[in-house]
Amino acid sequence: MTPAPTAKGTTLQVRRTIPASREAVFRAWTDPDVVRQWFGARGGSTLHADMDVRVGGRYRLDMESSMGTGSIFGEYLEVTPPERLVYTFRWDRVPVAIPDTQVTVEFLELEAATEVVITHERQPSRAVSEFHAWGWDGSLEKLAALFGNAKEAAGDG
């Protein structure tokens, strides 16, 4: 996946059609037991998920991959079931001087599926944006497989 170009080159958008209801996909995104089954880039896994899914609530996901272990964490800014999540996103290995990035996840209802649209903003560089695009693409591939279909939707970029 290639990040969508922007004025600063630090925002990416990833889309995937998931063969499940919007409610089921939203739950897969907000239930720690389900998140552990799919979240993380190809070849990686989520070992632990602690999530307080409410405005002002915090989350932490501990992950493992061929690059080692790491955690992401942040705060929920908007929770609108089953339509939208907005939250801050930070890696534990990132210096404090770099501001949090922000993720918006939209769950768009289709006839027999849900289109998930992830917009990841405020990234410090194009390279970081490309790394996150790779990670989101792998995560969404695993989420689609969880529901029985790993094919990308037409027009994914």
What positions do the PLM features span?
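Hydrophobic ligand-binding cavity/cleft-lining segments
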Residues: M1-G44
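Short beta-edge strand/loop motif at the mouth of beta-sheet-based domains
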Residues: Q13-V14, D33-T69, D156-G157
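Hydrophobic/aromatic beta-strand elements that line small-molecule binding cavities or substrate pockets
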Residues: R16, A49, I72-E78, T101-L108
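Hydrophobic pocket/interface hotspot
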Residues: V25, V35, Y59, Y76, ...
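Short coil-to-beta-strand transition motifs
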Residues: S66-I72, A97-D100
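Beta-strand/loop substructures that line and gate deep hydrophobic ligand-binding cavities in soluble
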Residues: V86-G138
